[in-house]
Amino acid sequence: MEHYISLFVRAVFIENMALAFFLGMCTFIAISKKVETAIGLGIAVIVVQTITVPANNLIYTYLLKSGALAWAGLPEVDLSFLGLLSYIGVIAAIVQILEMTLDKYVPSLYNALGVFLPLITVNCAIMGGTLFMVERDYNLGESVVYGMGSGLSWALAIALLAGIREKLKYSDVPDGLQGLGITFITIGLMSLGFMSFSGVQL
């Protein structure tokens, strides 16, 4: 249990998808203008990550990995070259289901997210979670914990940035830094703050 807790804490704070690896920056900057919308997208990313990382773990373990098809009498077959294609297919399917669900049950959030909801499919933070899982050879339990933690890390970062940007509207920002300029500086300062967790040994 201790191992899973440390993996979760490491995924959220020490290896933050947005502020340590700078993944998913396009959506991160574009949707962080309002806290409400940012939290909505953050929850969507958590859901997608929590489902896709374990799902891709099963596909990799039982179909793609070298020797994975031993159960089918094909121990020599290595389909790992199909990895990226398979992972993108799973991510696209999950995002499509999420999109249809939001359209039916939470149309206000669906409209607020606009084009950025289907763009979760190509959000490199989502793909990054799966690729880190494969690289680190996580088992199914670790994949579930890591998927949830990495999704939460991105959601936490975008919610924090949205809160700061809402406050910045009422600040006296120099003309040359208004808009994206001050946003990039803010992200840099947030990243420095999260760097303080890098010395924590779990």
Swiss-Prot record:
User: Which Pfam families does its entry note?
Assistant: Rnf-Nqr
Main location, first listed in the record:
membrane
E.C. no: 7.2.1.1
Q: GO biological process annotations for this chain's record?
A: respiratory electron transport chain; sodium ion transport
Q: Which UniProt keywords apply?
A: Cell inner membrane, Cell membrane, Ion transport, Membrane, NAD, Sodium, Sodium transport, Translocase, Transmembrane, Transmembrane helix, Transport, Ubiquinone
Subcellular localization(s) per the UniProt record: Cell inner membrane
| Reaction catalysis annotation | a ubiquinone + n Na(+)(in) + NADH + H(+) = a ubiquinol + n Na(+)(out) + NAD(+)
Q: Topology versus the membrane, per the UniProt entry?
A: Multi-pass membrane protein
Name the InterPro entries on file. NqrDE/RnfAE, NqrDE/RnfAE_oxidrdctase, NqrE
| Transmembrane regions | 11-31, 35-55, 79-99, 114-134, 144-164, 180-200
Q: What class of enzyme is it?
A: translocase
Q: List the record's Gene Ontology CC terms alphabetically.
A: Gram-negative-bacterium-type cell wall; plasma membrane
Q: Which GO terms describe its molecular function?
A: oxidoreductase activity, acting on NAD(P)H, quinone or similar compound as acceptor
Taxonomic superkingdom: Bacteria
Protein family membership = Belongs to the NqrDE/RnfAE family.
The record's function comment reads: NQR complex catalyzes the reduction of ubiquinone-1 to ubiquinol by two successive reactions, coupled with the transport of Na(+) ions from the cytoplasm to the periplasm. NqrA to NqrE are probably involved in the second step, the conversion of ubisemiquinone to ubiquinol.
Describe the subunit structure.
Composed of six subunits; NqrA, NqrB, NqrC, NqrD, NqrE and NqrF.
Entry's HAMAP family? NqrE
Q: What is the protein name for this chain?
A: Na(+)-translocating NADH-quinone reductase subunit E
According to its UniProt entry, this protein's organism is Stutzerimonas stutzeri (strain A1501) (Pseudomonas stutzeri)
The organism that produces this protein has a lineage beginning with:
Bacteria, Pseudomonadati, Pseudomonadota, Gammaproteobacteria, Pseudomonadales
Gene (UniProt): nqrE
